[in-house]
Amino acid sequence: NDIALIGEGVRQVYEEVLTPAGLGQVKIFTELGRFMLAPHGILVTKVTHKKKTYRTYLGVDASAVNLMRPAMYGAYHHITNMMNPDGQTEVVDVVGSLCENNDKFAVNRELPQTEIGDLLVIHDTGAHGFSMGYQYNAKLRSAEVLYAEDGSTRLIRRAERPEDYFATLYGFDFDKD
């Protein structure tokens, strides 16, 4: 995924096709969110439930509110168990905390054995985590922390608070006792 190589290929086609057709002034725009930003974000979530029925479910405290892509169209995001990254594996579904049947981060995924309280890292969430997030079922979007090349971190977006849930409503005074 060499962006310079891709750009050169686009430029060649532009000059071979658009310029001779009298369209050399046309501007081309692209959205590079996944390409540029996805690798630079992670979602950290805690395992809150483990249920074994006909399959094993890991319930986590995050949900599609925090990362919509897997629920919306089954997008794959690698998941690491930070408490047991190299342990024996088991096949699990990693499910969010919403009451919707598509609130899943992984289906039939082989992961190192996981226990309640373990922290999972869902990788490559930097592009469309917060921007695709939404307020639903009293779930609020999580904070965003920037992890710099030097290892330092800083808060770049605070977690939503309950008052944010109603911030755009008019005609109600939620501050009254």
PLM segments and residue spans:
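Charged (often Lys/Glu-rich) extended helix/loop segments that serve as interaction or gating elements
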Residues: 23-177
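Acidic, glycine-rich loop-and-beta core segments that form the ion-binding/anion-interacting portion
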Residues: 1-28
